[in-house]
Amino acid sequence: MIVIGIAGVVGVLVAMLSMSTGLNKTLTATGDPNRAIILRGGSNGELASFLDRSSSTLIKQDPAIARHPDGLPFASGELIVITEVPRKGQSSGANVSLRGVEPKGFDIRPELNILQGRKFKPGLRELMVGAGAYKQFDGLQVGSKLKFRGSYWDVVGVFETKDAHDSELWADLDTVQSAFGRSGMSSVVVRLNYSKAFDDLKRRLSADPQLTVDVKTEQDYFSSQSSSLSSQIGSLSNIVTCIM
């Protein structure tokens, strides 16, 4: 019995370390040197961050942000909420990130490819599903309906970015805010305008008395998320080792 118990603990430890390696690889592959992410000052991630609309509007006016020929900035206010979807082959559900994005959220991410279906339409309760989530969970096929907060959402597309966003569901920002009772957003993601744009952006936004924000390159942000995750899983692994 002791041998079986030890084998079980070792199996759990190996699984945890394997999961850590896989997640770290995904997170460190996420991000573009020409993009920056702006969070509320002191936040350790998008889930803990909150920016109101006035802050988002002010951020988007910075000249370091590239602009589309239509004159609008390449910037997307984005909101992360946690919801639940069915696991494949199981009756229980699992948490998944639902990201509300603005229309320019697609333009600033040229790596995003639509594998099936189409983009969601602003103002409608429509979802796009990341390729990773599509493989992992049930009920995410194009044409399916999911129920969040008492209302039904239509799955209209499957997308791939080959990074951490593949594990997410995407929808229109305003629609997500309305459905989940949120007045603001988690972050603003922007495409930079020139080679030293990040330094200028960070300097101006950090010095603006109307803002309390942290400004990071997208690569630095996801790298820090990877380091934090590694630390947490490492601590859990040490606890398991001590129990043995």
Predicted segment positions?
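Hydrophobic alpha-helical transmembrane segments of multi-pass inner-membrane transport and secretion
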Residues: M1-L23, S230-M244
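Mechanotransmission and gating elements of multispan inner-membrane complexes involved in transport
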Residues: R67, P86-G93, Q141-D154, V158-V240
